[in-house]
């Protein structure tokens, strides 16, 4: 061991090698020097624990240094290939934007824009003017605005409408979303007092009515988008709650969570309420996400009665939680696709959800055949996947995947694919790596084939 440690090359000696001089010209001397030190530190540690008993050749060492250097220069936030079959994969960024949305964001980011400028009047304008008319047209609401995500939207609504008073909501709707974001905690942060009514599995309209007092500021309904209570249950519809609110002059707020502008039942996904239905039911103000079933950028979209939305726009938090020009441009383009009637074809989330099992099976068979020609052992298998993003929690989508039989272990192959310059994220089932076709773009296939050619060689 001591002999091996003494034989480890010096940093300066390695930096003088032609291969690393070439690398330094590309990446910079500082980056290459750091890569050399990292590689030697790792080699030294491997020798000490006994996993390395022979020094690598100079060529092999240079290859390790080069790989380390290039890996360190890759951006931390970068694109991946989602082969999990989960369309709204929260950890992988949820909704993929449409080409139209990407072009719109690029168009306003490369130069100046009309973010807060009224071209007709030649004076300062309102940033929400770019999306408010579209949102009102699509949902039937009187007014609209946008915060930077749905949690922010809920925070703004409760702060503006309920601070210092009570908010009545059902015990069965006290949700927690990702990151321990709990509705009771949000109310406390807004200065509102939570008034729970009903039970976990059953809440009646009379429970809300009996709880109303002089301190009541709002009635809150929360769509349990990431879980369902089934069996002996009862809940109050938005329409019934809105009628109660009107009769007592109390605003009704609804957090729709995922948010949906089209009926997903034809795609096999039922019981996901649409925004239009809640607006038609008379809910005063409601919020939903932009980057889930809508298929746009991250945003907390708020629509409702003008008197409520105006209060929100004037609240100090509105400025702190407002969205930027890239988000507004991408959201406007996404909404325009709905207005044009091309959302199902244009928006990746919807087009992925709309793929039939037969289409997915044919795509899987084609990929499996091409992988077999590259020496990869694989077969086509049937899969069931959740939509993801906390949407439609009790239903799955039938799909097909290419199941790859690894040389060693599925875990080792999964890690290898994950560490590529363009990471490929797969699922493991029965010690095989699954490439689910539902979330694979046509442009992903060549990269996948190249990755498996390299692993097979």
What are these regions (language model features)?
Residues 8-9, 27, 81-85, 294-297, ...:
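Short Gly/Ser/Thr- and Asp/Glu-enriched loop/turn motifs at secondary-structure junctions
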Residues 76-77, 144, 288, 422-427:
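A short linear hydrophobic-aromatic micro-motif
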Residues 357, 361-443, 448:
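Conserved C-terminal alpha-helix-loop-beta "cap" of PLP-dependent enzymes
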């Amino acid at each position: 061991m001591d002999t091996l440690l003494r034989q480890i090359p010096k940093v300066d000696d390695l930096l003088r090698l032609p291969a690393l001089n070439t690398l330094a010209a590309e990446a910079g001397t500082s980056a290459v020097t750091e890569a050399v030190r990292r590689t030697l530190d790792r080699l030294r540690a491997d020798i000490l624990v006994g996993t390395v008993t022979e020094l690598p050749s100079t060529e092999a060492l240079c290859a390790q240094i080069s790989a380390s250097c290039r890996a360190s220069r890759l951006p931390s936030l970068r694109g991946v290939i989602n082969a999990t079959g989960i369309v709204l994969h929260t950890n992988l960024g949820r909704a993929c934007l449409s080409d139209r949305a990407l072009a719109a964001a690029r168009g306003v980011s490369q130069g100046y824009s009309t973010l807060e400028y009224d071209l007709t009047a030649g004076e300062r304008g309102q940033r929400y003017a770019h999306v408010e008319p579209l949102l009102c047209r699509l949902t039937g609401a009187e007014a609209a605005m946008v915060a930077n995500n749905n949690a922010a939207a809920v925070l703004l609504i409760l702060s503006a409408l309920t601070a210092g008073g009570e908010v009545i909501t059902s015990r069965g709707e006290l949700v927690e979303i990702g990151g321990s974001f709990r509705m009771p905690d949000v109310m406390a942060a807004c200065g509102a007092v939570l008034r729970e009514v009903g039970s976990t599995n059953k809440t009646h309209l009379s429970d809300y009515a009996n709880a109303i007092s002089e301190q009541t500021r709002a009635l809150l309904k929360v769509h349990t988008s990431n879980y369902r209570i089934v069996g002996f249950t009862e809940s109050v519809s938005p329409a019934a709650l809105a009628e109660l609110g009107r009769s007592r002059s109390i605003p009704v707020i609804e957090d729709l969570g995922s948010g949906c502008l089209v009926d997903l039942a034809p795609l096999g996904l039922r019981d996901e309420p649409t925004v239009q239905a809640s607006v038609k039911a008379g809910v005063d103000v409601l919020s939903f996400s932009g980057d889930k079933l809508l298929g746009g950028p991250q945003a907390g979209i708020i629509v409702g009665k003008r008197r409520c939305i105006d209060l929100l726009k004037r609240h100090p938090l509105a400025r702190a939680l407002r969205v930027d020009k890239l988000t507004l441009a991408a959201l406007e383009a996404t909404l325009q696709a709905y207005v044009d009637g091309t959302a199902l074809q244009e928006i990746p989330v919807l087009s992925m959800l709309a793929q039939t099992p037969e289409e997915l099976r044919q795509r899987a068979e084609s990929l499996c055949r091409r992988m077999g020609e590259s020496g990869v052992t694989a077969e086509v298998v049937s899969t069931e996947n959740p939509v993801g993003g906390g949407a439609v929690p009790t239903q799955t989508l039938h799909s097909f995947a290419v199941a790859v039989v690894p040389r060693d272990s599925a875990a080792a192959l999964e890690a290898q694919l994950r560490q590529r310059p363009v990471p490929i994220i797969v699922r493991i089932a029965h010690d095989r790596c699954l490439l689910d076709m539902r979330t694979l773009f046509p442009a992903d296939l060549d990269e996948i084939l190249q990755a498996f050619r390299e692993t097979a060689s």
